[in-house]
Amino acid sequence: MNTVNYLRISLVDRCNFRCSYCMPTGEAIAYLHRSQILSYEELLFLVGEVFLPLGIDRFRLTGGEPLLRRGVVGFVRALVGLPGVADVSLSTNAYLLEELAEDLYAAGLRRVNISLDSLDPGVFARITGRDHWSKVWAGIQAAHRVGFDPLKLNVVVLPGINEQEVPDLAALTIDRQWHVRFIEFMPIGNTGYFEQAGWVNSETLRSRIRERFGLGEGACYGNGPADVFQIPGAKGTVGFISQMSECFCSRCNRVRLAADGFLRPCLLNEADQIDLKTPLRAGAGAAQLRELVSELLLRKPEINFRERDRGTTGSYGRTMSQIGG
């Protein structure tokens, strides 16, 4: 089992999209009140006094949609500036990125992951519930222009909806140093839709790309979940995150902090998550909080392998947007 050195921080559970794979269709979402969400000051304390001393020095900001939270640029600047922070990245739907890309880059952010599930505006609207393709594409172009590198585009592949676009999306990597990652649809966020639609395995997607362009040998870089390939002669890469068909639990190096302060050891695991907000607001010191986190980290290998054996068959109380992806 890899050393855990990576924390995904959900800044907010709200989102301005309603993606079919992320939120239950037709159901109201009970969003958190502002007082229930960890403040920026609390987050910086946890990072500086709890996570960094435990060797966790890589951070990704997620949501919901993290750019919806007021003051996000200032928080990025403060987080990047903490002594010992090795890397800060951000996942976004890019709706607000055209306006914020320059400020985020100036604040020290260098890496962004952007959700782009279709190149067809109509299909995009069907998946996201919003007719915002042009604004998202403008946000992607702004991120490219400002200089974010690597610039990664994440595609959740949905059977019969956007799976036919996989080769066209992969082609974005040919002339640009972009990295397009195809993600197997999994039953967190909208289990009813998953049961209805199913999923497409990564090897099928690779075969389709290989038929049109060819595809080099795959590799796994670092501790990330993606298996990375390259179209011959392309500037960028294509990756496959295969949580349904190709288990990568053994190389997992991350934990997830929800906006309300629950620390989750595994995307699939709710039973073992711990509450950091309550003891923090009750006056617990850094040493006590570090002990809580340390105990969870010690149990993470056993939790990971238990979840791997169980598979994605559980009942999940939180949507993907509430977990932070």
From Swiss-Prot:
One of its GO terms (molecular function) is GTP 3',8'-cyclase activity. The keyword Calcium does not apply. This is GTP 3',8-cyclase. [4Fe-4S] cluster 2 binds at residues 249, 252, 266. Belongs to the radical SAM superfamily. MoaA family. Binds 2 [4Fe-4S] clusters. Binds 1 [4Fe-4S] cluster coordinated with 3 cysteines and an exchangeable S-adenosyl-L-methionine and 1 [4Fe-4S] cluster coordinated with 3 cysteines and the GTP-derived substrate. The gene is moaA. S-adenosyl-L-methionine binds at residues 21, 64, 115, 186. SUPFAM superfamilies: Radical SAM enzymes. Catalyzes the cyclization of GTP to (8S)-3',8-cyclo-7,8-dihydroguanosine 5'-triphosphate. Keywords: 4Fe-4S, GTP-binding, Iron, Iron-sulfur, Lyase, Metal-binding, Molybdenum cofactor biosynthesis, Nucleotide-binding, S-adenosyl-L-methionine.
